[in-house]
């Protein structure tokens, strides 16, 4: 079976402006959640389909951008396989609270993508 897109995330330099724009453009339910260590993460609930979130961009000098998360059974093995195929690891495998495990890569063309293993898999 294929690896579905599980989550999309907006890393923005202006959360307030992004919230205003997307809440008017789409019928999304936006819910703020406190993040460990401070700050706010906004969950995006879309009803049917892949949901997501938005947060302040953590990479100084990087333009606002969307990040796609692809579901994998084993994030460590998939990260290693991607690296063997020429990807660069931007964010190494890390736990995300009680939700799951992730990594962020750039493919051989320079495009960023995140791998996501839901908690309870493997």
What are these regions (language model features)?
Residues 1-2, 10, 14, 54-63, ...:
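Short, low-complexity cationic-aromatic patches
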Residues 2, 9-49, 96:
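Core segments of cupin and vicinal oxygen chelate
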Residues 3-6, 10, 31-34, 79-122:
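Vicinal oxygen chelate
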Residues 28-63, 108, 112-117:
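Conserved short beta-strand elements that form part of the metal-binding/catalytic scaffold
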Residues 40-42, 66, 101-103:
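Short beta-strand micro-motifs in enzyme catalytic cores
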Residues 43-45, 71, 104:
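Short, well-ordered beta-strand micro-motif
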Residues 46-47, 53-55, 69, 85, ...:
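A generic structural signal for ordered secondary structure
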Residues 64-83:
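Mid-chain, well-packed structural core segment of small domains
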């Amino acid at each position: 079976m294929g690896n579905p897109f599980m989550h999309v995330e907006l890393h923005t330099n202006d959360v307030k402006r992004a919230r205003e724009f997307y809440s008017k453009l789409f019928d999304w339910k936006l819910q703020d959640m406190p993040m460990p260590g401070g700050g706010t993460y906004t969950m995006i609930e879309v009803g049917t389909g892949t949901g997501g979130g938005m947060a302040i961009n953590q990479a100084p000098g990087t333009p606002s951008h969307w990040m796609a998360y692809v579901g994998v059974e084993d994030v460590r093995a998939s990260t290693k396989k991607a690296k063997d195929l020429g990807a660069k690891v931007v964010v190494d495998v890390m736990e995300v609270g009680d939700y799951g495990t992730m990594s962020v890569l750039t493919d051989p063309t320079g495009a960023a993508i995140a791998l996501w293993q839901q908690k309870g898999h493997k």
